Amino acid sequence: MQSMKAMTLLTSSAFMMMAAMVVALITNFAGLFPGDVLDAGLRSNLTILTLVVMLTLSMSRIPLQNLNPLKYGKSMARAIFLGMIVASIIPLVGYLLLKDTEYAAQAAGLVFIAATPFAGSVLPLSIILRGDAEHAARGTIVIYILSLVWIPFIVWLMLGDSVDMEFLVITVLELIGVPLILSRLLAKLEINKEILAAFLNCCIFFMVWLSVGATNFSGNAWWIFLVFVIIAVLRSFGLGTAVEVTEKRIGIHWGQRVTDILMTSYKNKGVAIALCVALYPPGMVAIATSILIEITWVAFMDSVLFSKKRMERELAAEGESVS
């Protein structure tokens, strides 16, 4: 019974992210993070390695099919528009408003959030929540391939020469290009879904602790944290609920709404962390603050927006049954 309870907690993204943030903040503010052992270079390498393993495993569950742009162009365009363009607007505007202040370095983290693709877990969440799984799978592959160009472009456009672009391109190829290739080698390997979910959540826990636990929050005025919180709330809660209200009003069914909301509001913070730790460490202040809000957003989606009762009611109204 206890092992079942433990597995339930380990497979809960909301619980593991919340636990990771609590442990990371306690470690940070209590001065317990072993920074003398886990220096910046080692943290960067560990973050990149962990993320490569995570993305390789998660992408190996995504089939390379239904990718014909002539047949599925509308679906691909929707994923690109919502998952890349719309999802990037608020953090980019936030950075532009802050780039000429004394906290420009910390605000640079918003650029990495903007450049980051949506989370790889959009597909499994779409399956669980009766979203459009085919669209989620297709969109994930397309977005991650385009991210090989999109991430360097956005970072170059916003941060220019302040970032080593050659190192950025190499890091992006390591983070996303390598998993895209390696994942095909594992595509036919049978992996227990619960064990995979628990392992990926443990990786997320480690990455959040490693990055947030080491982030230097001291010396920053209270108002900059408030600004980062507001930007994060608008980017997750604001965009997510806006997509829900807009699409429901124009008659789009539950399945498409679920996946569209996830693509728009649920960023892959692991990629943002890995890039920022490797290229622009001061920007971790903005990312750490954003993670705290995104954890709350995940819990809200799980318990309210995509609750089982609401899902059953919506699908019943659309003439579908919940098995």
Predicted regions and their residues:
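Alpha-helical transmembrane segments of multi-pass small-molecule/ion transporters
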Residues: M1-S323
